[in-house]
Structures are given as C-alpha cells and as structure tokens.
Amino acid sequence: GAIHYLTKEEINNHTNYLENRLQTGKEYFSNRGYDHISVDQNGLHGSVIRNLTMPKQFTDWHYSFDIITNMGTTEHIEPIESQYECFSILHDCTKVGGIMIHLLPDVRLHDEHGAWKNHCPFYYSKSFFEILAKDCKYELLSNTIINGLRCVALRKIKDVTFMQDKSKFVLLIAQRNQEWSSGFVRNFLRRKGVGHFLRRLNLR
C-alpha cells in the first residue's frame, strides 16, 4: 500500500482545516481516500465516543490502523498521569509498520515566544519524542516545527510493549499554568481535540 506524504507547504496550507466550517476532519480524510474513524467524547461529526484515558475501551482496535493522527488532542488530556494511557492507546491501535503523526504545541516555543499560550495544560519537546521513539522501537521519520507546532511522524516497526516506565514518561511532558478566562473556554478547548484514526481503504 502507498503512504501519501505532504510537503511543508501542503501542511501549512491545511494547518487550519479543522477550523474550516465547510469541512470536518472526517470529510477531509474521506475525500482523500481514507477509511476514517475519529474519537471524541462529544460524538460530533460522526466521531466514536470513547475515553482516551481508558485503554480497555480500545482493545478491539489493537493493531487495526495504518495511520493514526494526534492533532490537537493529547495536550488536553488530564490529569497529566493520563497522558501515559492516551499514548499507550495510540501505540496499541497502530499496526506494525503503521505511522503515528503528532502535531502538538511545542514547549520551547511556548516558553521563549508565547506560542500556544493558555491553549492547553501540556506541551511537548523534541527530546520527548526522541526518548519515546527509542523506548518503543519506533522509527523517527520526522521531528520538526511547523507553524509553532511540534510535528512528528513515527513508524511502529516492532511489536513491543509500550514504554513501561510510566513515571519516566510523565516527567518528559511539560506542564504549564493556564490563565483561562472562564470555565466555558477551558471545557470547550478540551472537547475540541479529536484523535483521528485512519485506515487506507485498500489496506484492510
């Protein structure tokens, strides 16, 4: 099967596609030939309602997906200890040979330039993904910055258990205080994240 790679220019052109009211994430990926499944607790836009902090809810999807994208989702998963369960779900649901794509707020850009300030409680670093890739035996395909986001592509090349040291994992994630204007804004942003589970139609 084929993997379709996007150039930086193409990614920049589509960075805000989820904000476009004329096209949901499901429409975006389905129109490009993907059998698309999204997970969100609000159940909007055809998403499946599952809790990304509860691995038992995903056992039926283990080794099911060729591509999993995490674009604006995990940085809203609280408390910080639940980050471990969320990333373990992504690991377990990806096929061997499959790819995980992460577009998440970068902690260095947050601290030095205020990028994505007050957007979320958790931020990620280059070293976080380097250590994650080493421990989980991923091939690190890309680990760069695009439009203020840490953009990472990881290929799962071996059937190994997810990073076993939870304490080590949690310490790698940066937590920053938020100055939320209201509880409504905080809850809205937390619900907004959507984990996209993609499966090429011709790779079932």
Range-by-range predicted roles:
Residues 1-2, 13-114:
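Conserved SAM-binding loop
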Residues 5, 29, 197-199:
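Intrinsically disordered, low-complexity, compositionally biased regions/tails
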Residues 11-13, 58, 191-195:
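Short, structured coil/loop segments at alpha-helix boundaries
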Residues 78-204:
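S-adenosyl-L-methionine-dependent methyltransferase catalytic module, highlighting the catalytic core
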